[in-house]
A protein has these predicted regions:
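Bacterial N-terminal signal peptides
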Residues: 9-17
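Bacterial N-terminal signal peptides that target proteins for export
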Residues: 1-8
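Extracellular/luminal ectodomains and secreted, surface-exposed scaffolds of diverse proteins
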Residues: 58-67
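Beta-sheet ligand-binding and adhesion/scaffold domains
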Residues: 36-39, 48-50, 69-112
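Extracellular beta-rich ligand/substrate-recognition surface
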Residues: 51-55
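Short solvent-exposed loop/turn micro-motifs enriched in small/polar/acidic residues
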Residues: 26, 33-35, 57-58, 81-82
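N-terminal helix-cap/turn-to-beta initiation motif at the start of protein domains
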Residues: 20-34, 42
């Protein structure tokens, strides 16, 4: 094996390790997150939304977690039985953000 092949193999291994280190998993999103307007609690099958204005909490059924590099797309059933999805990303040091979509704003969260 020549030096160029070894260098290429080491580089490919480094890239793969870096991608794996950034991979998002359930442990990254599980548990309670606090935001400006709501707090979220992620469990394997449910998302609980707690409002800061004393409205009753909403509990939604999660049908699927889709993990990508530094994001999680959650498919869930809303209050009228329609499936919706929400993307959470920017995981770093106990922080994350619900990504904006259409008329819905980006919402930052931190671990409670």
């Amino acid at each position: 094996m020549n030096k160029q092949t070894v260098a290429l193999a080491l580089f490919a291994g480094w890239i793969l390790a870096a991608e794996m280190a950034n991979a998002t998993t359930y442990k990254d999103i599980a548990g309670q997150w606090c935001g400006d307007v709501t707090d979220y609690v992620f469990a394997p099958d449910t998302l609980t939304v707690k409002f800061h204005d004393n409205r009753p909490a909403n509990v939604f059924k999660i049908t699927k977690y889709n993990y990508a590099n530094n994001s999680v797309r959650i498919n869930w059933i809303n209050g009228v039985g329609k499936e919706s999805d929400t993307v959470f990303a920017e995981f770093s040091g106990g922080k994350m953000a619900q990504q904006g979509s259409g008329d819905k704003p980006r919402r930052p969260f931190h671990r409670c």
